[in-house]
Amino acid sequence: MLNQNNQELFKPSKEFSRNARIKNLCEYYDLCDEAKEDFEGFWKRQALEKIEWFSPFSRVLNEDKAPFYKWFEGGTLNVSYQCLDRHMKTRRNKAALIFEGEMGDYEVYTYRRLLHETCKAANLLKKFGVKKGDRVVIYMPMIPETAIVMLACARIGAIHSVVFGGFSPEALRDRIIDAGAKLVVTADGAFRRGKPYMLKPAVDKALSEGCESVEKVLIVIRNNEPIEYIKGRDYVYNELVKNESYKCEPEIMDSEDLLFLLYTSGSTGKPKGVMHASAGYILWAQMTMEWVFDIKDYDNYWCSADVGWITGHTYVVYGPLACGATTIMHEGTPTYPNSGRWWRMIEEYQISKFYTSPTAIRMLHADAPDEPRKYDLSTLEVLGTVGEPINPSAWKWFYDEIGGTKSPIVDTWWQTETGGHMITPLPGATPLKPGCATLPLPGIFAEVIDEEGNKKDEGEDGLLCITKPWPSMIRGIWGNDERYIESYFSQAKKDGKAVYFSGDGAFYDKNGYITITGRTDDVVNVAGHRIGTAEIESAIAKHPSVAESAVVSILDAIKGESLFAFVVLSPASSCDLGGAIETLKELNDILRVEIGPIAKIEKILYTPGLPKTRSGKIMRRILRTIARGEEIKQDISTLEDSGVVETIVKLAKAEFE
């Protein structure tokens, strides 16, 4: 069965395109052709134009030890200098970071102030013995000090590893041990849904179970709740940093010196420490901010991601600051104190570029679909989505209600390992298609191929691979070269050479666009027909009573696999829990129209929620285990709400046993 994406195209407005950095598809293809005809020349030009080098690079790309690629060898720079110092001549009094806390507190950091605070933090880190190459684990909430400590590490050449503040002590411990961290920076706690929550006790528990490499712990006081202090190990950041000098010369860093480690989450076994290097990463962070969000000097830009994820690294901290933008940081949740929180912030801060997740969009749509109409959202110029494929109905609501049909949506595909956007529309150039990432960015050779490198025809399932290296790519897995090769360069080849496999499946549509079908382990095989769960879930979302769903496979004696749907009903749903059979028929009617008769749900279970990682990704492996009646062996400690798993297990037993 061939895949299709027959959604209508939405062309960029002529007014927006007129002033965009990339104004039309001709300009886009010109850049693509430049990269194709002179690959190294293309990247050399970008690097010379964008980065303020301390000393020039002598070699653009070193492929001698592929897939351990090296970029811009011989060049020296400092990422904090690129993000802060170089703006002092023209933007020193411009807002660099605007923070709004969960409880409504508010703070503005100009570029000058952010530089001074970064230097003070850098000097404090040095007093604690942190030097170039040392690892610093940051276990923090969404507060300005998190970004400041990241930049301070970059300034002195320390390698930071941010661990999301919602991870368990066990997950934190594993990452500290793997990185060999010398210092941990944390907070007493923060605020969520109007109430304080704690972080420091998790650090205490993690460090009580090993972590011999850790010498000291710095604690940022945020919520002022009582915490335990261990003498000689724990120190209060707020008290010490104010006494430091606001001057700190940036460390001279080689292009390939590591900037940070970021551990991939949600998987079993030892975490993978993804390594990113200084020059290539910051170059692509800046380029994608300028191209994909069409960042201008007047923009107030807001990415709602947590800094604990790669999206927060690249598109809350490093990318916006590298190009001199104003970045918004929000501590809380989108529905506290009500579902208008985000829309009020967009109105109040006059946000022009807004980047969030499909999960958040679906949640706000289901919770209060008319709430955005109470606010003036007219300042919005570009909307963006990240983290998972967005179903067309959520896309349309986002486009109509939030963007007022005038703001293009950049549906971005990328990964922790890629460092920045790979496949995405350009807001002034690319005709948009709901639920479709569209085209690779110039310089990115993303292709849908088979294991031997043959390009797939329209509608055929294939492996989404990147067949040439790029500057911001993963440099390896910390301490495990073999795992790096096995994880990313062992599944596909092109012209006899191993290429990067993303782990995602995809297909080309009739426009030549790439549609992501989801992780290759999120593909079900029904009677020999491979169907992406994202496609099924997008169709299910068209039912007016469905707020969210997750589809997994169960074993079928006849078909091999059949479909099991976990469905979360919208608050305004007319369905009742006794009407599952009726709803099942309605959903299958939709699937028959949207996909075909092969896509038929055999079992349905209404649930109050779905198990998700802290970054909003649905953990389908856990749901598959439940649907098949198997024992759960996956780690659920890193879930947003681990209690929902127990609830679903009970519901499944009551319904099907």
UniProtKB/Swiss-Prot annotation:
**Residues bound to CoA:** 192-195, 311, 592
The catalytic activity, as recorded, is:
acetate + ATP + CoA = acetyl-CoA + AMP + diphosphate
Q: Which GO cellular component term is one of those annotated?
A: cytosol
Q: What is this protein called?
A: Acetyl-coenzyme A synthetase
Which residues make up the binding site for ATP?
387-389, 411-416, 504, 519, 530
Give the binding site residues for Mg(2+).
543, 546
Q: Which residues form a coiled coil?
A: none
- This protein's gene is called acsA
Q: Which UniProt keywords apply?
A: Acetylation, ATP-binding, Ligase, Magnesium, Metal-binding, Nucleotide-binding
SUPFAM superfamilies from the UniProt entry: Acetyl-CoA synthetase-like (SSF56801)
| Superkingdom per UniProt | Bacteria
Q: How is it modified after translation?
A: Acetylated. Deacetylation by the SIR2-homolog deacetylase activates the enzyme.
Is Ligase among this UniProt entry's keywords?
yes
Quote the function comment for this protein: Catalyzes the conversion of acetate into acetyl-CoA (AcCoA), an essential intermediate at the junction of anabolic and catabolic pathways. AcsA undergoes a two-step reaction. In the first half reaction, AcsA combines acetate with ATP to form acetyl-adenylate (AcAMP) intermediate. In the second half reaction, it can then transfer the acetyl group from AcAMP to the sulfhydryl group of CoA, forming the product AcCoA.
Cited PANTHER family: ACETYL-COENZYME A SYNTHETASE, ACETYL-COENZYME A SYNTHETASE 1
Please give the cofactor(s) recorded in the UniProt entry for this protein.
Answer: Mg(2+)
- The modified positions for N6-acetyllysine read 617
The taxonomic lineage of its organism, from the top, reads: Bacteria, Pseudomonadati, Campylobacterota, Epsilonproteobacteria, Campylobacterales
Q: Organism, per UniProt?
A: Campylobacter jejuni subsp. jejuni serotype O:6 (strain 81116 / NCTC 11828)
Query: What processes does the entry annotate via GO biological process terms?
Result: acetyl-CoA biosynthetic process from acetate
Asked if the Swiss-Prot or TrEMBL record annotates the protein with the keyword Chloroplast, the reply is no
Q: Which protein family is it in?
A: Belongs to the ATP-dependent AMP-binding enzyme family.
